Amino acid sequence: TSCIYQFSLDEMNRGTIKLKPGKADSHLIADFKTAYTNRGDWAGADGITMDSKGNLYTGNFGNGVMSKITFNDDGTVKSNKVFVQDKGLTCCDGIFYDAAKNVIYVSDSEKNAIRVVSMDGKVTTLSENADTNGADGSMDQPCEVLVRGNEMVISNFDMPFPGLKNTKFDAPYTLSVIKMK
């Protein structure tokens, strides 16, 4: 089980926060389960972002399902629903909301790809490449993505888990850049 917890700034400034085990902790706002994956491992929630309306999104590394969490005015959870479940998105690692384009970019570590998710949950591919060492700037298991000006900066993890396109460790070419329009 993967979880998302919510803490006030006041609580954090007071020092160490001790959590209660399992679902007993009042800070717990969402939990997610993943079945054993087709890659032969267990994986869970990975990546978190918020849109311009204050909705929170997370993806599941193990199966690519994205969830959308909405909030009441007092900050409590209003809903936690599946936002995307698409055969074209089988792995969510880092995710980034681009306010200028009103889309979410997803690092698909399994397929060496960056996916684009529209606010109505449609998935398209921005970039995908074969298993490379990254020396030419191509992706080598992207794990985080962000947009800076007219560039998308991608951090590469380069960890050869079974079932991923990335099959071996390479020299540390850790960043890739895609020029945006």
Name the predicted role of every residue range:
Residues T1, M50, L56-G62, D98, ...:
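Conserved beta-strand positions in repeat-built beta-propeller and related beta-rich domains
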Residues T1, S26-N55, D86-V103, N133-G149, ...:
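Beta-rich, blade/repeat-based domains predominating
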Residues T1-H27, D31, Y57-N63, S67:
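Surface loops at the rim/top face of extracytoplasmic beta-rich domains
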Residues S2-Y5, G64-S67, N112-I114, F161-P162, ...:
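Structural signal for beta-propeller blades
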Residues I4-S8, K168-K181:
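Beta-propeller blade signature
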Residues F7-K20, I69-T76, S118-V123, K179-K181:
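Short loop/turn segments immediately following beta-strands, especially the blade-tip
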Residues G15-K33, V77-Q85, V123-A130:
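Beta-propeller fold detector
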Residues D46-D73, V77:
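Oxyanion-binding "anion nests"
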